[in-house]
Curated annotation (Swiss-Prot):
The modification N-acetylmethionine is found at M1. GO terms for cellular component: cytoskeleton; cytosol; plasma membrane. Residues 213-215 form a propeptide. Keywords: Acetylation, Cell membrane, Cytoplasm, Cytoskeleton, GTP-binding, Lipoprotein, Membrane, Methylation, Nucleotide-binding, Prenylation. It comes from Bos taurus (Bovine). It is found in: Cell membrane; Cytoplasm, Cytoskeleton. This is Rho-related GTP-binding protein RhoF. The modification Cysteine methyl ester is found at C212. Belongs to the small GTPase superfamily. Rho family. Plasma membrane-associated small GTPase which cycles between an active GTP-bound and an inactive GDP-bound state. Causes the formation of thin, actin-rich surface projections called filopodia. Functions cooperatively with CDC42 and Rac to generate additional structures, increasing the diversity of actin-based morphology.
Length: 215
C-alpha cells in the first residue's frame, strides 16, 4: 500500500514481444457455478462439461487471430467460493486482462459483480482492463429455470442490466454468451484479446512518452 493507504498499482505485465506471436494472460473470475469453467472448456477444448465440478485453479491455453496477429491466450480459471478468497489473488500477478462473469439466471451472481468482484479485481489488478460477461443466456428461455426463478419472485438479468453494470465498473466491454450452445464464445475471447492488446499498446506509448520527457 502507498502512504495514503491505497493499494499500490499492480506490477506492469511483461510486454508481449514486438513481433511474431503475442502472448496474453487472462484471468476469469465470478461466483462459483456461474459458467466460468464451461466457457473456458468450450473455447479451449471444444467440450461442454455435463456435470458441475467446482474448479480450484486451472490453466487453459488457446490461440486467436486478431487482425494479422496470432495471439496465444493463457486462460486462468479461478475458484469463486469464499474458501479460496485468500488464495485467488495469487492468480492475478502479471495479468493483462480480467474477465468478470455472472450467470444471467442468478441475480446474486450479478449483484456480486459490484459487491465482490469489482472491488477485488481493482484492488489486486489496478489499471488492468476488465470485460464483463453474462453467461448461460440459453437458460433465459428454459421454462423450468424460469419457473424456479419466478417462484422466488425473481427475474433473469437482462442485457440492459448487464450493460448498466459494465458502465458502473468501467469495464471495457459487456458481452453475453451461451457456452452450452457455443453462442458468442469465440467473440468473448477475440474481443478480450483486442482490449488487452490495445491496453498494452497504450502502456507502451505512455512509457515512451515518459522516457522522452526525461531525455
Amino acid at each position: 500500500m502507498d502512504a495514503a493507504g491505497a493499494p499500490a498499482p499492480a506490477p506492469a505485465p511483461p510486454a508481449a514481444p514486438g513481433s511474431g506471436r503475442k502472448e496474453l494472460k487472462i484471468v476469469i473470475v465470478g461466483d462459483g457455478g456461474c459458467g466460468k469453467t464451461s466457457l473456458l472448456m468450450v473455447y479451449s477444448q471444444g467440450s461442454f462439461p455435463e456435470h458441475y465440478a467446482p474448479s480450484v485453479f486451472e490453466k487453459y491455453t488457446a490461440s486467436v487471430t486478431v487482425g494479422s496477429k496470432e495471439v496465444t491466450l493463457n486462460l486462468y480459471d479461478t475458484a469463486g467460493q469464499e474458501d479460496y478468497d485468500r488464495l485467488r489473488p495469487l492468480s492475478y500477478q502479471n495479468t493483462h486482462l480480467v474477465l468478470i462473469c455472472y450467470d444471467v439466471m442468478n441475480p446474486t451472481s450479478y449483484d456480486n459483480v459490484l459487491i465482490k468482484w469489482f472491488p477485488e479485481v481493482t484492488h489486486f489488478c489496478r489499471g488492468i482492463p476488465m470485460v464483463l460477461i453474462g453467461c448461460k443466456t440459453d437458460l433465459r428461455k428454459d421454462k423450468e429455470q424460469l419457473r424456479k426463478l419466478r417462484a422466488a419472485q425473481l427475474e433473469p438479468i437482462t442485457y440492459t442490466q448487464g450493460q448498466s453494470a459494465c458502465e458502473q465498473i468501467r469495464a471495457a466491454l459487456y458481452l453475453e454468451c451461451s457456452a452450452k450452445f457455443r453462442e458468442n464464445v469465440e467473440d468473448v475471447f477475440r474481443e478480450a484479446a483486442k482490449v488487452a492488446l490495445s491496453a498494452l499498446k497504450k502502456a507502451q506509448r505512455q512509457k515512451q512518452h515518459r522516457l522522452c520527457l526525461l531525455l
